[in-house]
Amino acid sequence: MLMMFPLVGQAQASVVVVDSCDAYDQVTSALGIGNDKLDFTTYNGTFASVDVAASICTVELSASSGLEGILGSYLKTDTVGETLVIHFEEEVRSVGGFFFMVDKFQLPVIGILELELSDGTSFLTSLTEDGGFAGFISNTANIESLSLRGFGPSMFAAPAVSSLKFGVVPSPAGLALLGIAGVARRRRRSV
């Protein structure tokens, strides 16, 4: 289970924090944010970094020690005590995922998830031993990176991610096309 500080749905500095994948999907949909998803359960072995080109954004995952993929489970830092950095190349307005911390024996431990926005604002979320979903949605500032690091007992753990959702706000031209498509569909139904 994921414990959130601040708790579900609290808005601060135009950022909504959620601890449910369903809530994340509902809020991003209501704000017109188009989402994409990445699954890291297919990675196996060690990597200096991982660059993934998704349909709406390029995402880079890195750690100073490199990354290790555990097939069927997650992608984590190669060394305990490192910070897992997820960097977005394009203008991302929402990010959420299933995050957790594992020790050198691959056992889950508690940890802290930190989100850094492009304006320098940061938000913290506490992860329980089971990890869980954490989502952050901004309606004003772009999210450039997400850092997952361990504090306290989890300083001797490796941050991990199994899947990631992220979204962009459609451009005004994209919104206009969506509006035209909606009008065309409505006319077709009324005929």
Q: Model segments located where?
A:
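Surface-exposed, well-ordered secondary-structure segments
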Residues: 14-168
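Intrinsically disordered, low-complexity segments enriched in proline/serine/threonine
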Residues: 8, 110, 172-174
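Sec-dependent, cleavable N-terminal signal peptides
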Residues: 1-14
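Short, charged juxtamembrane terminal tails flanking transmembrane helices
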Residues: 188-191
